[in-house]
Amino acid sequence: MYKYVEDKLFLSRMRSLCGEIMQDLCHTLKEEYDIGASFYLVGSGARNLILQNANRPIDLDYNLEITRIDDWEDCKEIKECVRKAFNIVLREYGWSDCQDSTSSLTTEKRHFNQGNSTEFSMDICIVCEDTDGNYHRLIHDKRRFPNRYFWNQAPNSRNIREKAKYIKEKEKWTLVREQYLRIKNQYLTSNDYNHSSFICYIEAVNNVYNSRKHWN
């Protein structure tokens, strides 16, 4: 079962290293491919939602949000540019190339040689926000030949950032943490691996936001 990672020093070291890698990725995308992007951990900021399943490796789930690009519809080119840029950065840190999965780019598992030696990896989901405030994930469907690349709208994602901000302002973020943990474990126990961390996060924020009339 999932639980929140409590080792604050380890969390700080892990987030610092991976944050540097993500910053370098955004810089490389701009310099090499003229693509504007920003990044954030799912859950964002100091109140992130980093979970660990028992003693298994930790996945740091990042959204790489594309903010500027010449052709939004060439999804294959976008995925390839991000993959190539990510590999350039990973090699600079002595990491192996990333793996291209359906909805993310995943790194190898790493660990620190001193202190907490728990293994961790990075999962990067490429996203964009449309003019109506909906979020879309870049999907690489490998089941078809030729492979299909497309933007897939995340269900119920409209204005999710504003909803999360409202919840934090009302100091009810603990409710989101509770919901997120419950949802992740619910899908885990039912062997449902089709719901990414971002989808679970959207579900948690909406559940809490929609129950705001019942807040104490």
Please report, for each region that a protein language model flagged, where it lies by residue.
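Active-site nucleotide-donor binding segment shared across nucleotidyl transfer reactions
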Residues: 29-60, 64-73
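Helical scaffold of the NTase/Pol beta-like nucleotidyltransferase catalytic core
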Residues: 1-41
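Predominantly extracellular/lumenal beta-strand repeat domains
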Residues: 47-49, 65, 80, 98, ...
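Alpha-helix boundary/N-cap detector
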Residues: 5, 9-20, 73, 77, ...
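Charged/polar, solvent-exposed surface patches and flexible loops
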Residues: 16, 20-27, 31, 80, ...
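Short glycine-rich, low-complexity/disordered patches
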Residues: 24-42, 91-108, 189-202, 212-216
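Conserved catalytic core of two-metal-ion nucleotidyltransferases
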Residues: 29-33, 79-132
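Right-hand nucleic-acid polymerase module
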Residues: 114-216
